[in-house]
A protein has these predicted regions:
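Flexible loop/hinge segments that line or gate small-molecule binding clefts
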Residues: 92-93, 97-137, 148, 155, ...
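Hydrophobic alpha-helical segments within soluble ligand-binding/sensing domains
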Residues: 24, 70, 129-156, 198-199, ...
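Extracytoplasmic "Venus flytrap"
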Residues: 23-50, 57-73, 82, 88-92, ...
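Hinge/cleft segment of the Venus flytrap/periplasmic-binding protein
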Residues: 20, 159, 163, 167, ...
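Short, low-complexity disordered leader/linker segments with a strong preference
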Residues: 1-23, 55, 100-107
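Short, solvent-exposed amphipathic alpha-helices that sit
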Residues: 35-51, 138-142, 166-185, 202, ...
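Short beta-strand elements in bilobed, periplasmic/extracellular small-molecule ligand-binding domains
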Residues: 49-63, 155-158, 176-196
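Hydrophobic alpha-helical
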Residues: 84-104, 175, 187-188, 192-253
Length: 305
């Protein structure tokens, strides 16, 4: 299920103190984002099927940039003496100090969805395995599919997620890889903070400033939904392509009727489960295989209908 490679992750948890039924905390980003609701549902369904193996505590924050709120949740989980923390960090750098507190408290920490900044993690002298997809590869797949509908010299805009997050940066890089290979010009790059309304505002601004834009590449499907509304409001439906990333339920009818050309599925319902499975292995003292960079890669696929 998980891609295995050469290096084994170090195990730093105190096994002797682990109760028979470990408590695992799932800490996500905004539960206003359908992607994280799907992730939570998947984790709860898995726990129900494995209720004898662990207890699950799940939490999310009010919006995608609420690092203070997410920090408070992690601090509460430390006080609650959970055995493992599976976290999709709201910020790749700002969340590292509180994650170090969790590691120092003997909690097994697994990073999912958005990778913590490796340099900052290293500077804190901790090891936090990342369980998740190759975001750059996923975005490149979407971008390459879009490029086939365009021609060299066409102009496009990229609506990025929260710019301080690794997954936003990686998806932008993947989109750019595909556009550069096809000689398509990225004329605008702005952050939509992963959110529908902000994504729509950014899309409207791009369409107004660059009337020749032929496509909008959104770093997630929530922003793609906003972009679809902006395209319609600008009277450019059918003339400006929109692509996204996540394959949330809200995007599926738009893929069917052509309002959205493509997205990437990174299997939200399974992402937290991958992290939980890894945490349980470490808690039990089992060997967990990963790449040399501490990454356990999970699937990502192009979706066009």
């Amino acid at each position: 299920m998980l891609a295995a490679a050469s290096a084994a992750l170090p195990v730093s948890s105190a096994f002797a103190a682990t109760p028979e039924k470990p408590k695992i905390a799932l800490v996500m980003k905004s539960l206003a984002n359908e992607f994280f609701l799907t992730m939570e549902d998947g984790a709860k369904a898995y726990q129900k099927d494995h209720s004898g193996d662990f207890e699950l505590i799940s939490n999310g924050i009010k919006d995608e940039t609420d690092t203070a709120g997410q920090t408070r949740i992690v601090e509460q989980m430390i006080l609650s003496k959970v055995n493992a923390l599976v976290i999709a960090p709201a910020d790749s750098k700002a969340m590292v100090p509180v994650i170090k507190k969790a590691v120092d408290a003997g909690i097994t920490v697994i990073n999912i969805d958005n990778q913590l900044d490796p340099a900052v993690v290293k500077s804190k002298n901790i090891t936090v395995p990342f369980v998740g997809p190759d975001n750059r590869k996923g975005a490149r797949l979407v971008g390459e599919y879009l490029a086939k509908q365009l021609k060299a010299g066409d102009e496009v805009g990229i609506i990025e997620g929260v710019s301080t997050t690794t997954n936003a940066q990686q998806r932008t890089a993947g989109f750019k890889d595909a556009m550069e290979a096809a000689q398509i010009k990225v004329v605008s790059l702005q952050s939509g903070d992963w959110e529908i309304d902000k994504g729509g505002k950014v899309a409207s601004s791009m369409l107004s400033e660059y009337p020749n834009i032929k496509a909008l590449l959104a770093g997630n499907d929530s922003m793609a939904v906003g972009a679809v509304s902006a395209v319609r409001a600008a009277g450019k439906a059918g003339k400006v392509q929109v692509v996204g990333y996540d394959n949330i339920n809200a995007i599926k009818p738009m893929l069917k009727d052509g309002r959205v050309l493509a997205t990437a599925d990174q299997f939200a319902a399974r992402q937290a489960v991958f992290g939980i499975e890894t945490a349980l292995k470490i808690i039990k003292g089992e060997k967990v295989d990963s790449g040399a960079n501490g990454v356990i890669e999970t699937p990502v696929e192009l979706v066009t209908k």
